[in-house]
Each structure stands twice: as C-alpha cells, then as structure tokens.
Regions:
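Outer-membrane beta-barrel initiation region
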Residues: 69, 106, 295, 345, ...
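Short coil/turn segments that connect the beta-strands within blades of beta-propeller domains
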Residues: 98-100, 147-149, 190-192, 236-238, ...
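Beta/coil-rich, acidic/histidine-enriched accessory regions frequently appended to metallopeptidases
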Residues: 2, 26-150, 156, 168
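A short beta-strand motif characteristic of beta-propeller blades
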Residues: 77-84, 126-133, 172-177, 216-222, ...
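Short loop/turn segments that connect beta-strands within beta-propeller blades
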Residues: 119-123, 167-171, 210-214, 258-261, ...
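A flexible loop/linker signature enriched in serine peptidases of the S9 family
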Residues: 86-88, 105-116, 132-137, 153-164, ...
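Conserved beta-strand position repeated across blades of beta-propeller domains
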Residues: 94-95, 143, 186, 232, ...
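Transmembrane beta-strand segments of outer-membrane beta-barrel domains in Gram-negative
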Residues: 471-534
Length: 534
C-alpha cells in the first residue's frame, strides 16, 4: 500500500513540477523511447530517476510541513490513548456498556483478523472470534444488540457475505443468512430488526431483516450509481441515517424517518451535502439529537457534529493525522480512532464545537491549478457510447469458434542433455473459456537420433459452463519428445522420448475460502517411450 501511495504522489509531483505531458510521454512506448523505464525517464525529464526521487522527497517534506503549520494555526485537539499501540485496520465500533469495552473487528500484522473487545479504561484486548474472509480496511460489517448481547457480523466480505450472530458472553455462534450479500449492518432496538445494504448486479438496495433473522425484505432499490453506506439507527428506532454517493461522485448525509421509509417514502427529513468529500461513519448520539462522524472536508479527516433537527454542521476536532469512526458516549465525549503509521489507535476526546479549522493544500488541486489542461482530461460517460452501433454480430457464442492468436514468442528448451530452439503460439477466445497452445522446437544436437530432434507439444483447454455433471475444465494434450526449459539447468530431467496423449478434467466441488475442494483426474497413453530411470 505504501509503495502504491508513494508512487501516486511521485507521479503527481512530476506532473506538477514538469507537466502532465511529460508524464504521458514517459508512460508511452513510441518511436525514440527506451525499453528501460529508468533510461526513458532520463530522456523525458533530463535527469536520472534517483535524483528526481530525492528531489520529490525534499519537496514532500516542505509541502507537508506547510500543511501541518496550517493545521496548527488553531489549537489541535488533544486526546487520551486507550491502548499502548495501534490496532491496524478497524471496523465500525460499539460500546458494550455492561463490560465497558469497545466491540469491533480488528486486523493487524501478525494476528488473524477477529472480532475483539477493548477495555475503555485501558487494559488487555480480548479476541472473541476469528473473522472468515475479512476486508482489508473496513475489516467487517458489524452491529450490536445490547439487550440480547449479540454481535452481528459478516464473513466472506469480498464475496457473497454470510451474516453471523455471536453471543458476546458464551461465544456461541450461529449462521443467520448464507450468501446474503448484505453489509453496512445497523440494529434497530425498537423492533430488534437488522438493516443493511445489499449489492447485486451493480445495484444497491436497502433491506430489512426482521427477528428472528431468517429472511430479508427489500425496502428500496436505488438507481444505478447511487450507493448508500454507513447506516445507523437512532436508539428510539425513529430515524435512519445513511451516507449516499451518486454516480457523479457527490456525497451527502441523509436522515430518514423509518416510518416513512417503510411506506416507500424516501424523502429525507434532513440532508447535508458534502460535495466530493465522503461523510464517513456517522452515528447517532445516545439521545438522538446529534450525528457524529468524520470527513476530509478540510483536507484532514476531522470529526463533525450535525444537529438532526436543524442540520447545523460543526467541526469538533482539529487533527493533524486524522480522526475516524467516532463513538458518542454523550453529546460532549467521544471515543474515536486516530491514524498512525501502524494503523488506527483508539482514543478518548472532548467534542467541543470549533469556530475555525484550517484547510490544507492538496497536491492534486495545486497541479490542476498550475496546469489547466488537466481540467479537460476527463473520462467520458458510458452514456455517450452507442452500444448498439458496436455490435458486429448476433449469434450464440462458442468459445472454440472464437479462438484467436493471443501471443507468439521464441523458446529455448532442454531435451535430455541437448538444447532445442523453437516457437510457442498461444490462442484463446475473447472471454478466456478456451485456450490452445502449440509449441514446436528442434534440437541443435546433431548427435541425437533423427526421430528425437523434433519437439512438439500441444495443449487445449475447454471450459464447459452449464449445470450438467460435465461442467468444468477439460484438457486435451499431446507431446512428441516432450522438452522442458528447466532441463537446461538441473540434474532432474522431465524430457522424454516418445508420444504422450492426455485427457484431463478438473471441477471445483467446494469454494468457501479458506476451504476448497476439487475433483481432478488425468488419463494418459504413452507410446514409443524410453524406459524411465530407476
């Protein structure tokens, strides 16, 4: 991740310091360019890459130093750390008032992702349950029922998502819904229902899961490109809050009366527009009067308080590295997470409304301001493309009938103790159901018998997509004097004189990571073979 972030900043700095056209010229491979990215960098930018990298580091220190000075124009928010070290990635968090612990999903190096509990007053964290299939940054979608002391959370978070109920005290676990594809969980204390967002075929839907959680009911499907996230429900069960992003990249925080939502009225009672910045993790205060959450509204992730009745919007933190996922204890005290180089650290702070918070400079915005041509570099809308005009044929698709040349390249192989040279040709269809590779080579060793000098290897894979028992990947291959690249080096030889015909089949029987099961078999026929060495 750090390498990705550093690379992104470096490329942006190149565009800022030189021009966007320089960056494009370096990325292109046209006449006059060099195969080596380092050599081509020097051609385009007029200096070695390592020198430019050091210049960027010096620039970055100065740039970020100025940003920190801007933040410090006004007093920064003080806080009390709840743990001696950071906890990596963290999910939404709840307070278990009975045990005075924070309940959340955690994922950090050296420890398997898990549902855990952290004492609010300090102390050793407790691991409650490992998470199957955690997400990298959000970790897990989680909700909490304090009355039954049940933790609801999701597994397989990058796949179809199961919803699990975990008893906080006994550790007993139950799968409620399998492959439900529902996340962003929120619990309604008034009727003990679970709410969430279900994703399918590119569309997001608001769903309600009534007790005892055996089925979900559709509440509202949203237009394509409109995605609600970070649901929360007030303690009295009257209001639902959600952040909403639209297809233009604009975001808002909305508050809805649950009674109206259930009557198919999704007109918000309150809406606060955040523009291009995301409203994240907004949750109701215990009395339902406020919503607390975070946003990069000032360029740094600060905490904000929104009056549910009036929509008044106030900053309650001035952070240097950012605060995230606030948990209101009351209207003045928050538990939250501050960002460190090792991940998120839980902290306690006072939510005092601030009159002034400084913005910081964005390198991207500075680059656009300096090079106005970037304002015209925008991706077009898919709606601008006439899909019908691009259809070249209408027919049933057959993978074998759509095989085309994918690549071709020379090969060097080892055959016994000699060297063979030749070519390999790879073919595949447009959606990679079928593939064919043909490799032909000839030994340069004139001492080999004539019938052993040619090397031929043909491999064809055909994927059957259907509900029949024959669905799976079929493999048909033939080798004549099979040769292998690694026979050029090691004492173990895989090359063999003669013919080999193979029919193989592979079928996935179970795919439920980390568990998987496959059926695999191969039938081989050999002829004119040398005896294998003992």
């Amino acid at each position: 991740t750090n390498a990705y972030l550093y690379g992104t900043r470096f490329i942006t700095w190149l565009a800022y310091n030189w021009s966007p056209e320089h960056v494009v010229d370096w990325a292109k491979r046209d006449d006059g360019s060099h195969r080596s990215y380092r050599k081509d960098f020097e051609r385009v930018f007029g200096q070695p890459l390592d020198d430019a990298w050091q210049e960027w580091i010096a620039f970055e220190r100065e740039f970020q130093g100025a940003n920190l000075e801007s933040v410090r124009t006004y007093p920064t928010t003080t806080y009390q750390a709840l743990t001696p070290e950071a906890l990596g990635s963290v999910s939404r968090t709840y307070i278990d008032e009975e045990t005075r612990t924070l309940i959340a999903g955690f994922q950090y190096p050296g420890v398997i992702a898990h549902i855990g509990a952290i004492p609010v007053d300090g102390g050793k964290a407790e691991q409650l349950r490992e998470i199957k299939g955690p997400a990298l940054y959000q970790v897990v979608s989680i909700a909490w029922d304090p009355e039954s002391r049940t933790i609801f959370y999701t597994t397989d978070n990058y796949e179809y998502r199961d919803i699990i109920a975990l008893d906080r005290d006994t550790g007993k676990e139950e799968v409620l819904l399998k492959d439900a594809r529902i996340g962003d969980l929120a619990f309604n204390r008034a009727d003990k229902s679970l709410w969430g967002i279900r994703h399918l075929n590119g569309y997001a839907s608001l769903v309600r899961i009534p007790h005892p959680y055996t089925e979900w009911n559709l509440v509202k499907s949203f237009p394509y490109g409109t995605v609600p996230y970070d649901l929360d429900i007030s303690r009295d069960g009257q209001f639902l809050s959600t952040s909403v992003g639209d297809i233009r990249g604009k975001h808002s925080l909305q508050v809805h009366a649950i009674e109206d939502v259930l009557l198919d009225d999704f007109e918000p009672e309150q809406e606060v527009n955040f523009g291009d910045t995301l409203p994240e993790g907004f949750t109701f205060s215990p009395d339902g009067k406020y919503l607390f959450g975070s946003s990069f509204y000032t360029g740094v992730s600060n905490l904000f308080r929104i009056d549910v009745e009036t929509g008044e919007f106030e900053a309650v933190s001035n952070a240097e590295t950012g605060f995230f996922r606030p948990v209101p204890i009351d209207n003045e005290t928050l538990l939250a997470y501050t960002f460190t180089g090792q991940g998120f650290m839980p902290v306690k702070l006072t939510a005092t409304p601030l009159e002034d918070v400084s913005n910081i400079r964005s390198l991207g915005a500075q680059t656009i301001a300096k090079h106005r041509v970037l304002e015209t570099w925008k991706a077009g809308s898919p709606d601008d493309i006439d899909a019908e005009s691009r259809i070249v044929a209408r027919d049933n698709y057959t993978a074998g009938g759509n095989l085309g040349l994918e690549s071709m390249y020379p090969v060097v192989l080892g055959y016994k103790d000699s060297v063979s040279v030749g070519w390999k040709f790879n073919f595949s269809d447009h959606i990679m159901l079928d593939s064919l590779s043909i490799m032909g080579a000839h030994s340069v060793d004139s001492d080999l018998p004539t019938d052993e000098r040619p090397n031929i290897m043909i491999d064809y894979k055909h994927t059957v997509v259907s509900a029949s028992p024959l669905a799976g990947t079929w493999n048909f291959s033939y080798a004549r004097n099979g040769a292998d690249f690694y026979d050029l080096f090691g004492p173990t030889k895989r090359s063999r004189k003669g013919n080999r015909f193979t029919v193989g089949f592979e079928k996935t029987m179970l795919s439920d990571g980390p568990k998987s099961s496959s059926l695999l078999f191969n039938v081989n026929y050999f002829s004119d073979m040398d005896a294998l060495p003992r």
